[in-house]
Amino acid sequence: MIRVGLILCCIFIVGVFEASSADDILTAHNLIKRSEVKPPSSSEFVGLMGRSEELTRRLIQHPGSMSETSKRGPPKKGDFNPNELKPESNIC
């Protein structure tokens, strides 16, 4: 009976020791993990919905791109005439 109690006590002590060292290992691992990996800043992170907004912004910034030109089609006769622009004489 004493041997069984002694064996159970040893198992309990070893279990407590292993659990505490496992917590230390996890804590050390989490600290290392936090220091190595930087979270993305708000300007770096682009969500799934943000990607379509980013693509739309790019198309607006570059209206003469091939994709926009092909979508618009050929210019119509009455749309824009560069000869109609009058130079302003009041520009300093």
UniProtKB/Swiss-Prot annotation:
PROSITE patterns documented for this protein: TACHYKININ
Residues recorded as bearing Methionine amide in the entry: 49
Gene Ontology terms describing biological process: neuropeptide signaling pathway
Subcellular location field: Secreted
Record's keyword terms, sorted: Amidation, Neuropeptide, Secreted, Signal
Signal peptide: 1-22
Annotated TM spans: none
Entries under InterPro entries matching the protein: Tachy_Neuro_lke_CS
A GO term from the CC aspect: extracellular region
Tissue specificity as recorded in UniProt: Expressed in the posterior salivary gland and more specifically in the mucus-secreting gland cells.
Region (Disordered): 61-92
Propeptide: 23-37, 52-92
Family, per entry: Belongs to the tachykinin family.
Biological role stated in the UniProt entry: Tachykinins are active peptides which excite neurons, evoke behavioral responses, are potent vasodilators and secretagogues, and contract (directly or indirectly) many smooth muscles.
Protein name as annotated: Tachykinin-2
Protein's organism: Octopus vulgaris
Record lineage: Eukaryota, Metazoa, Spiralia, Lophotrochozoa, Mollusca
